[in-house]
A protein has these predicted regions:
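Short glycine/serine/threonine-rich phosphate/pyrophosphate-binding segments
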Residues: 20-23, 44-47, 74-77, 99-105, ...
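N-terminal small/polar loop signature for handling phosphorylated ligands or for N-terminal nucleophile
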Residues: 47-115, 119, 124-125, 243-255
């Protein structure tokens, strides 16, 4: 096998305690009129006020848009961009969790190219660069600070939708673990489990033939040497730090591991992509109205059990990264870790009713970009069996 890898990343990535204090000097190199995109809770936070003061001290004018809503409804992104046009920002700064960062990406896109988010759904539909983006995450999970993806919710489709383009990767990302110290245990668990799922799905994704041009034709190309490097590092960090961060939010060493793990997982899946756990979560989330991280983490042990015959070498490497004895220990240990931090053990526990199993399976099978990235194929009946097993809490029937 020829060694092949590709990486898409911010032009500048800062990680470490206190690095948020570099915002003013960085922003001043990108423009003089900054639009901050955040939510109402963070807009009233002292940390955000301090960031605004930094920008103003650097002679950067600031407009704060605190209209971000969970899961970024399409209409909210349209309204935010409309309201910002008269201000004419030079750059957009997203501050907050994954929804705030995805909202910032969407607003920068609409301000740059017009139209509606619907015009850009799918891969590579963004025609060119967007306004310079700075991403400052305050949770450790989605990895949006380094990925080419913005996820929104579309009421007309009753599902989350994605805009995927390298043009959406922030120009600068500032990952300061101190901003996560106040994150509640429940949110820490959900976000961190999402990050661990990103890393595992990126590491176990299908490996495609690296024909020249594949990284230009597709946003998500499957696993490769570079994505594997970041994914394995992320798995090790998250396995070490996640439970500790949930138990003691003031444990700065654990917070650092979780945030760095989430960022590295973003670098991994930003090129490798995710797979079946994400495909199934989208319809599950639509009908149960549960958090994305809860759904993908709940599903991960079942998806890995199905995939196990195709990913034996990867399971051995995950075992090494996680400090486990061998590949057979990985899936039970992952399920136990998730149980200890409060992840539901089955889709039934998540609120999915029996009568929606067939619908979820049908919808999941239709998300071809994710199913085609899965290391073991899933036909419609196999998908139905997988969803039913995850609903009933029965991994054994997938072996």
């Amino acid at each position: 096998m020829n060694l092949f890898g590709t990486l898409r990343a911010p032009r500048e990535l800062l990680f470490g305690a206190g690095q948020r204090h570099a915002l003013g000097s960085i922003a001043a190199t990108l423009g003089r009129r900054a639009l901050i995109v955040t939510d109402t809770r963070l807009a009233a936070d002292a940390d955000l006020r301090a960031l605004v003061d930094q920008l103003e001290a650097a002679k950067v004018t600031v407009l704060v848009d605190s209209s971000t809503l969970p899961d970024v409804p399409v209409e909210s992104a349209i309204a935010s961009a409309k309201n910002a046009r008269e201000y004419r920002p030079d750059l957009v700064i997203g501050i907050g969790g994954g929804s705030c960062l995805d909202m910032a990406k969407s607003v920068a896109l609409l301000l740059s190219h017009g139209g509606r988010p619907q015009d850009y759904y799918g891969e590579n539909a963004v025609p060119g660069p967007v306004l310079p983006l700075i991403a400052i995450p305050t949770t450790a999970g989605t990895g949006s600070e380094v990925t080419p993806v913005a996820v929104l919710s579309d009421a007309e489709r009753s599902l989350k939708v994605g805009i995927s383009s390298a043009h959406l990767i922030p120009m600068v990302s500032i990952c300061d673990p101190e901003l996560t110290l106040s994150c509640p245990a429940g949110l820490t668990a959900i976000a961190g489990a999402d990050a661990l799922t990103h890393a595992i799905e990126a590491f176990t994704a299908i490996r495609r033939d690296p024909v020249p041009g594949i990284a230009q034709q597709r946003v998500f190309i499957g696993k490769n040497a570079l994505s594997d490097h970041f994914a394995l590092s992320a798995i090790g960090l998250l396995w070490q730090g996640l439970e500790a961060a949930c138990k003691d939010g003031a444990d700065q060493a654990a917070r650092e591991k979780v945030m760095l793990g989430a960022t590295l997982a973003g670098l991994a899946f930003g090129v490798a992509g995710t797979a079946a756990a994400h495909a199934i979560q989208y319809p599950v989330g639509a009908v149960t109205h549960t958090a994305h991280g809860l759904g993908v983490a709940c599903l991960m042990p079942y998806v890995m059990t199905w995939n196990a015959p195709a990913i034996r070498p990867e399971l051995a490497q995950i075992a090494d990264a996680a400090g486990l004895d061998g590949p057979d220990d990985v899936i039970p240990a992952l399920a136990a870790l998730f149980a200890r931090i409060g992840i539901p053990a089955s889709l039934r526990d998540l609120g999915l009713t029996d009568d929606r199993i067939d619908w979820v399976a049908e919808q999941s099978s239709g998300i071809s970009r994710l199913i085609q990235n899965n290391p073991r194929p899933l036909n419609p009946q196999e998908m139905r069996n997988l969803v039913a097993a995850a609903h009933g809490g029965d991994r054994a029937c997938l072996i």
